Amino acid sequence: MRAIGRRIDGAPAASGDEDWLALGLEAMRALDFERALTCFDEAVTAQPTSHAAWYSRGMAFYNLGDDTAALESFTRASGYQPQSHLAWYGRGVTLVEMGRIDEALEAFDQSIALEPDSYLAWLAKGMSLIDQQRWEEALVVLRGAIERHQGAAQAWYGLGVAHLQANHAGEALMAFERSVELQADFDLAWYGKGLALLQAERVEEALEALTAATTANPQCTLAWMRQAETLEQLGRLEAACAAYGQVVQHTPTTEPLHGQAQRQLQRLRP
């Protein structure tokens, strides 16, 4: 979800001589979130009722991973400007990171009510419904996101996930294919395509998609693991061991996936 939240082009426009706000937005575009936060702190000190400054401060905290401070800033922004759909959106994505999904969905609903054409709130709501395994509801909402922005690779990816979980392999495959057409290096969309192809029993094509996922992101351990399992089932044990080795290499030892891959390697290489 945090990747969705890193959208600063929709920040409220500065007005008057709000130099600190402008400098902060410039720093956000440069992905210098610490400098941006310093500027936004100055902005809210100079203009403590500026919802634009509070919203932007929230985005800086959000990108720095300080969700408690981000939520406080977004709450201040919505307090000063209750009609700000961006402030409600910011609250929503932060609440998702905090695991407060029901509250996040309420915030996204409020954002959509204020600005029905903002695809980001539709997208975030759809992905949150996926987190709650509410597949059919997610499908409806993600279609709404795509209607508003057909070029949103993340929305097509989410649509694919929901279709896959609802056992709609054909629809899932079409959605994942559209996602990677829009963003060729989207590793999770390639991974999803691989899963959809496996569900459709198109194993060789699935391996190609899983390989594309790990090419796009060599640390995509989910794709490495599924690739390894599939290769093992096909009897290609040397290639399977190499893929399990990639899982071990790229997964922290504290994560269950690391142990699973390590055990598979030990079993295949006694």
Regions found by a protein language model. Give the residues of each.
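Terminal, low-structured helical/coil segments at or just beyond the last alpha-helical repeat
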Residues: M1-A14, Q233, C241-P270
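Alpha-helical segment of the N-proximal tetratricopeptide repeat
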Residues: S15-A52, S56-N63, V93, M127, ...
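Helix-start (N-cap) detector for alpha-helical repeat units in TPR-like alpha-solenoids
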Residues: D17, H51-A52, H85-L86, Y119-L120, ...
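Canonical tetratricopeptide repeat
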Residues: A22, S56, N63, G90, ...
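Structural signature of tandem alpha-helical TPR/SEL1-like repeats
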Residues: A30-E42, L64-R76, M98-Q110, Q132-G144, ...
